[in-house]
Amino acid sequence: MDVNPTLLFLKVPVQNAISTTFPYTGDPPYSHGTGTGYTMDTVNRTHQYSEKGKWTTNTETGAPQLNPIDGPLPEDNEPSGYAQTDCVLEAMAFLENSHPGIFENSCLETMEIVQQTRVDKLTQGRQTYDWTLNRNQPAATALANTIEIFRSNGLTANESGRLIDFLKDVMESMDKEEMEITTHFHRKRRVRDNMTKKMVTQRTIGKKKQRLNKKSYLIRALTLNTMTKDAERGKLKRRAIATPGMQIRGFVYFVETLARSICEKLEQSGLPVGGNEKKAKLANVVRKMMTNSQDTELSFTITGDNTKWNENQNPRMFLAMITYITRNQPEWFRNVLSIAPIMFSNKMARLGKGYMFESKSMKLRTQIPAEMLANIDLKYFNELTKKKIEKIRPLLIDGTASLSPGMMMGMFNMLSTVLGVSILNLGQKRYTKTTYWWDGLQSSDDFALIVNAPNHEGIQAGVDRFYRTCKLVGINMSKKKSYINRTGTFEFTSFFYRYGFVANFSMELPSFGVSGINESADMSIGVTVIKNNMINNDLGPATAQMALQLFIKDYRYTYRCHRGDTQIQTRRSFELKKLWEQTRSKAGLLVSDGGPNLYNIRNLHIPEVCLKWELMDEDYQGRLCNPLNPFVSHKEIESVNNAVVMPAHGPAKSMEYDAVATTHSWIPKRNRSILNTSQRGILEDEQMYQKCCNLFEKFFPSSSYRRPVGISSMVEAMVSRARIDARIDFESGRIKKEEFAEIMKICSTIEELRRQK
């Protein structure tokens, strides 16, 4: 029988059909090769938007810099970065006027945080530009390298462990005439392989000392490394994103802390909250506008899009904002916060790996590193690339491009949101002093604008005024990409609003399925995703039950763990059948051991091991939860773990799931091939760092300590902790006298070794 699909929707309100429009099946596009071209695009575009500004030269680095601030007022609709300082300051003043005490209170909160933050805050985050090796590294390694080099250059304030003291070292390092660094270099040599007796090229890595003069060091300290943003859907071209080095990160963190504190107090800000909390906050603004537009007023909403938000923002503007926000605060605090925007006004963009050339006839490939672009003959490049390189050449120093205007992606999300909200705030009737007024929502570069007025002309006038006000602070609303609708239907940060936010369940589809971490985590993540979608995304009970059955099926195929009594043959079925036959209580077997599935939509919150524990045979319990099992490389699992789930749109989300450590919580071993490459030294550093941290955690399990505040080193802290614990254990009879004596002896030996060092 043929079914007319439109009949399915007869009874469905149109907003509930949004999940059927899901466009994102299949994998998102990833970038390959070099990001140099995208970075040059960014640099050239940013300068083009500010081209009528003033050129100056940085006296320290010799970098040419373009300053568009207080430049010409716009005469057309082209995007531009000519923000007017007095307009930004006035917007800030009005914002404070509408929210008395907001800046004062946020400054006090931030000041407290600044004094308490530990330097290990900077180990969060993924890839970070490591200025010592001139490439990206995991954040923890980059920080360790920076601190190590600071100390060897006599900068020791960081030893207190406070972030603010580390930043003092950063400031001092910029005044030094030279910095001595340890860097890696590659050696290739031909050796005879013992086994095959053939000649092979062996790559080794060496460490060497290198002196950087003030200019070279400053360039590195101000460098943002660039990469291509991956997995961006709905875009034809890739684009570049930046990762700053350790010198900049700490300062940015404090500025963002202040801005976050302000955003929390602004009802129009879509940051820093997320999920349902964000929806509730936004729904309030819409409700306010709709209630106020009684029968006499029209209300329209613009689903807004800004042209190149961060390329038209300017760090000098952020400096003006911070100067205003902190105007009554202590000098030290104002200085700390103004350094990030100053560093960004002098930033350098690293052009990445450079270009790869290959000659088909000669079967040759060669890489042109970014450092060579300044003086290579352009005849090798195609027209498009030629133009890019010609344009960027005046800005190049040592393979980095001077990029004073613009912000690079994702650096000051909170602070730029404050700027956006300050313009939305100007829409109150008491400020517009006319019949139209506006309000809206802002989340980084995304906005929704709600305009109320007695008639259509008023709406048009309100939109125009908003548009022009934005231009004055370097925000360019795109007339092509924004669209206007009667209030009640709009989109904001991928939330669709139609008389309330619509649950767009299809956006979560990519996160359903088996993650591929290990049997234990995958089961837990799978059921948690279903549970969360029942709570947050209108996933109904019948659909959830079906999702669960599909998940279990998927899981069994992934790990080849079909039920012990099944006919399906896989390479595990022989073992699983044997286990099934030996087991008295078959319901107690985990799904990954060929057991039945006991999950239904009522018990998704219980980890599988707990769900089946009472049903398990005793010897199975003993095998399953056996920390001494030699075949499992065990990690100690906290009661809650974090998984990264990918929605179809927007950033990867972190999701908590319950983790019960069993012999199924294995961790795959690291690929051995890395050990023969140049990365080996780095890997060893990383492992040593990891070992130290793990050891420290053993002495101070997170439940029992507040992070040590004080100047003792990690070793001193552990030794004193060991002595205290040993004494308590000895006095309560948990350890014998000999053991106590041995512990004390080891502690003394460690201290002695430290003194000799």
Swiss-Prot record:
Keywords: Eukaryotic host gene expression shutoff by virus, Eukaryotic host transcription shutoff by virus, Host cytoplasm, Host gene expression shutoff by virus, Host nucleus, Host-virus interaction, Inhibition of host RNA polymerase II by virus, Nucleotide-binding, Nucleotidyltransferase, Phosphoprotein, RNA-directed RNA polymerase, Transferase, Viral RNA replication, Viral transcription. Transmembrane segments: none annotated. It comes from the Viruses. Its EC number is 2.7.7.48. Residues 249-256 are annotated as: Promoter-binding site. GO terms for cellular component: host cell cytoplasm; host cell nucleus. Phosphorylated by host PRKCA. Its main location: host cell. One of its GO terms (biological process) is DNA-templated transcription. It is found in: Host nucleus; Host cytoplasm. A motif (Nuclear localization signal) lies at residues 187-195, 203-216. It catalyses: RNA(n) + a ribonucleoside 5'-triphosphate = RNA(n+1) + diphosphate. GO terms for molecular function: nucleotide binding; RNA binding; RNA-directed RNA polymerase activity. Residues 55-64 have a biased composition (Polar residues). Residues 286-483 form the RdRp catalytic domain. Gene3D superfamilies: 6.10.140.720. Pfam families: Flu_PB1. The keyword DNA repair does not apply. Belongs to the influenza viruses polymerase PB1 family. RNA-dependent RNA polymerase which is responsible for replication and transcription of virus RNA segments. The transcription of viral mRNAs occurs by a unique mechanism called cap-snatching. 5' methylated caps of cellular mRNAs are cleaved after 10-13 nucleotides by PA. In turn, these short capped RNAs are used as primers by PB1 for transcription of viral mRNAs. During virus replication, PB1 initiates RNA synthesis and copy vRNA into complementary RNA (cRNA) which in turn serves as a template for the production of more vRNAs. HAMAP family: INFV_RDRP (MF_04065). Influenza RNA polymerase is composed of three subunits: PB1, PB2 and PA. Interacts (via N-terminus) with PA (via C-terminus). Interacts (via C-terminus) with PB2 (via N-terminus); this interaction is essential for transcription initiation. This is RNA-directed RNA polymerase catalytic subunit.
